[in-house]
Amino acid sequence: MSFSSLYKTFFKRNAVFVGTIFAGAFVFQTVFDTAITSWYENHNKGKLWKDVKARIAAGDGDDDDE
């Protein structure tokens, strides 16, 4: 894609340029958030509440108070 066709498509009208920026930011945010959440949950597997809650409900919790 040459520069002139890129200019005519995205940069000539400000509304299209701003819309492209917002759409790109939205897509980047969605992909970045999904990737970071997946990495975080994988890195902390077994330590998160959703993992601990299942063990407590099953009765495998080590309760020294009882």
UniProtKB/Swiss-Prot annotation:
Entry keyword annotation includes Transport: yes
Regions of this protein lying in the Mitochondrial intermembrane compartment: 44-66
Keywords: Electron transport, Membrane, Mitochondrion, Mitochondrion inner membrane, Respiratory chain, Transmembrane, Transmembrane helix, Transport
Main location: mitochondrion
Any one GO CC term of the record: respiratory chain complex III
Biological processes, Gene Ontology terms: aerobic respiration; cellular respiration; mitochondrial electron transport, ubiquinol to cytochrome c; mitochondrial respiratory chain complex III assembly; proton transmembrane transport
Membrane topology label: Single-pass membrane protein
Pfam families per UniProt: UCR_UQCRX_QCR9 (PF05365)
Domain of life: Eukaryota
Places the protein is found: Mitochondrion inner membrane
Topological domains, Mitochondrial matrix: 2-17
Any further remark recorded for this protein: Present with 4550 molecules/cell in log phase SD medium.
Family (UniProt): Belongs to the UQCR10/QCR9 family.
Subunit structure: Component of the ubiquinol-cytochrome c oxidoreductase (cytochrome b-c1 complex, complex III, CIII), a multisubunit enzyme composed of 10 subunits. The complex is composed of 3 respiratory subunits cytochrome b (COB), cytochrome c1 (CYT1) and Rieske protein (RIP1), 2 core protein subunits COR1 and QCR2, and 5 low-molecular weight protein subunits QCR6, QCR7, QCR8, QCR9 and QCR10.
Function, in words: Component of the ubiquinol-cytochrome c oxidoreductase, a multisubunit transmembrane complex that is part of the mitochondrial electron transport chain which drives oxidative phosphorylation.
Alphabetized PANTHER family for the sequence: CYTOCHROME B-C1 COMPLEX SUBUNIT 9, UBIQUINOL-CYTOCHROME C REDUCTASE COMPLEX, SUBUNIT X
Protein name: Cytochrome b-c1 complex subunit 9, mitochondrial
Biological source species: Saccharomyces cerevisiae (strain ATCC 204508 / S288c) (Baker's yeast)
Record gene name: QCR9
